[in-house]
C-alpha cells in the first residue's frame, strides 16, 4: 500500500515512523510519503491561503496550489481522503474498506479548510471521501490523518505480531460491532482489586461467555446506539 499525505506541517506526521506503523514502513509493507504543500507555490511568500469569498473570519486554502499537488501525486486509482469536521464519520468499517486500497492520499487542510472546488475537481478523475473522526473541530487535518492511517495500517497483514488480536477488537465484526470488554494481567490481586474469578478458572467456554456478556454490558452502558436490540441480559457477568 502507498500512502501520500499533503500538509503544510510535514513534521506532524512523524509519529507514524514509530511503533507498529514505523515497522510496517521499514519492512516495506507501506510506502508512506509526506509532502509539503508549499512545494507547489510560486510566489515569494509561498502562500497557500487567501480571504474567503463572501466574507467571514479566517482564511481558505487556495485551489491552484492544491490542484497542482494532486495533479502530481494522485491518479485515477487513488482514493483521496479529505479530513474535515463536515465529513462523514470515520469508523472501523471504513478503516477495513480502506485497508484494501492500493493508494491513499490524505489532503490535510488548515484554517477554514480547502477551497471546495479542489474536492469537486478531484472527484472528476478519482474517488474522493470527505471524512470526520468525530463531532469536534481540530486546527487541521494532520492529527485526524494520523488517527485514520494508524487504524488502517493495523488491519494490514503482517503489521500486528499476532493477527488474532484484531479478532475481538471493539467495533469488529466478531463482536457484532460492540465494544471490547476489560483486560487483566498479573498479579491476580492488586490494591484490593481482584481479577474476575472466571478468568482464572481455565474454563474456556465460561470465559468466552463472560467476555460476550461484559462486551454487551459495556456497550449498553457507553454506546447503546451500537446495539440493534438494546434490551439484553442484565446479569452481572463479573461473578
Swiss-Prot record:
Keywords: Cytoplasm, Methyltransferase, S-adenosyl-L-methionine, Transferase, tRNA processing. Residues 163-187, 217-239 are annotated as: Disordered. Its EC number is 2.1.1.228. It comes from the Bacteria. Its main location: cytoplasm. It is found in: Cytoplasm. SUPFAM superfamilies: alpha/beta knot. NCBIfam families: PRK00026.1 (NF000648), trmD (TIGR00088). Homodimer. This is tRNA (guanine-N(1)-)-methyltransferase. The lineage of its organism: Bacteria, Bacillati, Actinomycetota, Actinomycetes, Mycobacteriales.
Amino acid at each position: 500500500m502507498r500512502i501520500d499525505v499533503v500538509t503544510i506541517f510535514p513534521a506532524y506526521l512523524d509519529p507514524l515512523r514509530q511503533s507498529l506503523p514505523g515497522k510496517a514502513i521499514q519492512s516495506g509493507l507501506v510506502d508512506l510519503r509526506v509532502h509539503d504543500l508549499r512545494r507547489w507555490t510560486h510566489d515569494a511568500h509561498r502562500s497557500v491561503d487567501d480571504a474567503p469569498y463572501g466574507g467571514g473570519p479566517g482564511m481558505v486554502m487556495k485551489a491552484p496550489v492544491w490542484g497542482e499537488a494532486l495533479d502530481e501525486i494522485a491518479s485515477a486509482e487513488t482514493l483521496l481522503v479529505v479530513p474535515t469536521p463536515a465529513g462523514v464519520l470515520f469508523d472501523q468499517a471504513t478503516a477495513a474498506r480502506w485497508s484494501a486500497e492500493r493508494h491513499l492520499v490524505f489532503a490535510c487542510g488548515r484554517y477554514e479548510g480547502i477551497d471546495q472546488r479542489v474536492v469537486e475537481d478531484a472527484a472528476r478523475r478519482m474517488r474522493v471521501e470527505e471524512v470526520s473522526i468525530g463531532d469536534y473541530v481540530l486546527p487541521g487535518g494532520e492529527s485526524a490523518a494520523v488517527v485514520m492511517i494508524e487504524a488502517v495500517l493495523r488491519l494490514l497483514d503482517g503489521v500486528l505480531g499476532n493477527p488474532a488480536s484484531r479478532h475481538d477488537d471493539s467495533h469488529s465484526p466478531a463482536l457484532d460491532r460492540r465494544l471490547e470488554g476489560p483486560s487483566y494481567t498479573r498479579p491476580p490481586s492488586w490494591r484490593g482489586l481482584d481479577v474476575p474469578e472466571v478468568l482464572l478458572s481455565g474454563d474456556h467456554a465460561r470465559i468466552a461467555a463472560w467476555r460476550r456478556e461484559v462486551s454487551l454490558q459495556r456497550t449498553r452502558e457507553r454506546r447503546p446506539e451500537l446495539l440493534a436490540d438494546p434490551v439484553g441480559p442484565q446479569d452481572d457477568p463479573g461473578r
